Curated annotation (Swiss-Prot):
Protein family membership: To yeast FMS1.
GO biological-process terms attached to the record: pantothenate biosynthetic process; spermine catabolic process
Gene name per UniProt: CBP1
Keyword Oxidoreductase found: no
Keywords tagged on the record: Lipid-binding, Steroid-binding
Pfam families named among the record's database cross-references: Amino_oxidase
This protein's name: Corticosteroid-binding protein
InterPro entries found in the cross-reference section: Amino_oxidase, FAD/NAD-bd_sf, Flavin_monoamine_oxidase
Length: 489
């Protein structure tokens, strides 16, 4: 038997963009909890923000399994709001973990300073920018191919050691895009950042809790996966009908859709897809499919002692030379040093507690999240390189592996750029600001990190998109709704 609810504004998704949209609508208008409803597929709120409980750690540490940093810290609205709201002590709750990396390869420590390797990396990145900016119509190349092109063109100016290491060191960008470098778009590989990256020691769970406290509990519906949106509804005096797999029908006047791009792009035949009636315009469907979804994961190892140089913030272990198809689906554990390693030293972040937080990229993320018991087997030979005096390293006393790629409602980490991808159409179409683009209904808006050109893939991007979508809905209500709701501020 179907159940029904009716509300003025419905928000699909209780991630940071959905929660911020709901909080914005409630705080900027005289709408109440009866007027705003947030429906979430999972049994928790937060979306891709997830902070562990200390009970999951043998060392009493809270880990962010999703986003961990305040990126673009000079212009980060979330950082500023959390400090202004008293949620963050900028002296003890955050840490700039950007001391120069200590880098290793399978043969030992990499001579970063003596061989001027970072200077060559800077040159490679500048070459990539110049190549695509000077030739706006030039076909895209993968990061691997554009780096190879650089070495071919400037081989005469590069030393043997720089040739040996620098190409492999450029694979650090895999930890930004969540995919291997043979798939990363060269055109979008090098970006400009608005400030340093500030590690959130306290955890983003506090942001989620703070937003949720400003939304009535009755306005949050969990474990209700949406499977249909009827955007031209004629029943119950409401313009939109949303249905869930559990048989719940929700009628609303305004809708904000915040599900990840990975869900929007699913074929209708998938049991986790959302069916639209009428179907979305073909151009919008094409724009949704014009980008992809990355798989940045984490493997956390806790030990009974620190065996690495605890004066360092982070470690990088570069991969061996590999010419194969790095992006293919893994059916067995790859050899160590096939994919690079990036580790954050939580021993320095948390006062001597022996913990390393390792970032992973697709397809390794997908494999390890499916086979978490094999994580140590892959990383142990690589982490051995960090050992002081080359003493045998201990086995971990605790291992935590993320599960983002196995979560059917998320399916990865955040939007990313494959070679030949272009995010501009998607961002323009989902904004709803341009006539004949996106969908024609002004009472339906989209939000999420994939809908914005500022802070794409980041918490502050999702947060700002929630504010923007909410403001658009409120403006529409104020302009057109006969009930005459007032907007505050």
């Amino acid at each position: 038997m179907s159940r029904t609810k009716s509300t003025k504004v419905l928000i699909i998704g209780a991630g940071v963009s959905g929660l911020k949209a709901a909080e914005t609508i409630l705080s900027k208008s005289f709408l109440t909890g009866d007027d705003v409803l947030v429906v979430e597929a999972q049994n928790r709120i937060g979306g891709r923000l997830k902070t562990t409980d200390t009970s999951q750690s043998k060392l009493g540490i809270n880990y962010d399994l999703g986003a961990s940093w305040f990126h673009d810290s000079l212009n980060n609205i979330v950082l500023n709001h959390m400090i202004n709201d008293g949620l963050l002590d900028d002296e003890k709750d955050v840490y700039f973990d950007d001391k120069d990396l200590k880098t290793f390869s399978s043969t030992g420590e990499v001579p970063i300073v003596d061989k001027k390797l970072n200077r060559v990396l800077e040159d490679i990145e500048k070459y990539i920018q110049l190549y695509f900016n000077r030739n706006l119509g030039v076909p895209d190349l993968s990061l691997r191919d554009i780096v190879a092109q650089y070495f071919e063109k400037y081989n005469r100016l590069i030393t043997e050691e720089q040739r040996e290491y620098c190409g492999r060191m450029m694979r650090y960008l895999e930890f930004w895009f969540g995919i291997s470098w043979d798939r990363i778009s060269g055109k979008y590989a090098v970006t400009t950042h608005q400030g340093r990256n500030l590690l959130n020691k306290k955890g983003y769970g506090y942001l989620v809790e703070s937003l949720a406290k400003r939304i009535p509990e009755s306005s949050l519906l969990l474990e209700e996966p949406v499977n249909k949106i009827i955007r031209n509804n004629k029943d119950a005096g409401k313009r939109v009908l949303v249905e869930t797999i559990n048989g719940l029908q929700i009628f609303c006047d305004y809708l904000i859709v915040t599900v990840p791009q990975s869900i929007l792009s699913l074929e209708e035949s998938s049991p986790y897809s959302i069916k639209w009636e009428p179907k979305l315009p073909q151009r919008l469907v094409e724009s949704i499919n014009s980008i992809h979804f990355g798989a940045l994961g984490k493997v956390i190892f806790e030990f009974d002692r620190i065996f690495w140089d605890n004066s360092k913030d982070r470690f990088q272990i570069i991969a061996d030379h590999t010419d194969g198809d790095l992006s293919r689906e893994l059916t067995e554990l790859p050899k160590p040093f096939t994919y690079p390693l990036f580790a954050v030293n939580f021993g320095r972040v948390h006062n001597g507690k022996a913990s390393l937080v390792i970032l992973t990229q697709a397809p390794l993320t997908n494999y390890l999240e499916t086979h978490p018991d094999q994580a140590w087997q892959y990383y142990q030979p690589m982490l051995q390189k960090l050992s002081i005096n080359d003493e045998p390293i201990p086995d971990p006393i605790n291992t935590i592996v993320t599960d983002w790629t196995t979560n059917p409602y998320i399916r990865g980490s955040y939007s990313t750029m494959y070679t030949n991808d272009d995010p501009s159409d998607l961002i323009i179409s989902l904004s709803g600001d341009f006539e004949d683009l996106g969908i024609s209904e002004p009472y339906i808006k989209f939000a999420g990190e994939h809908t914005t050109s500022e802070g794409t893939g980041c918490v502050h991007g999702a947060y700002m998109s929630g504010i923007y979508a909410a403001d658009c809905i409120l403006e529409n209500i104020f302009r057109n709704d006969v009930t005459g709701y007032t907007i505050i501020g």
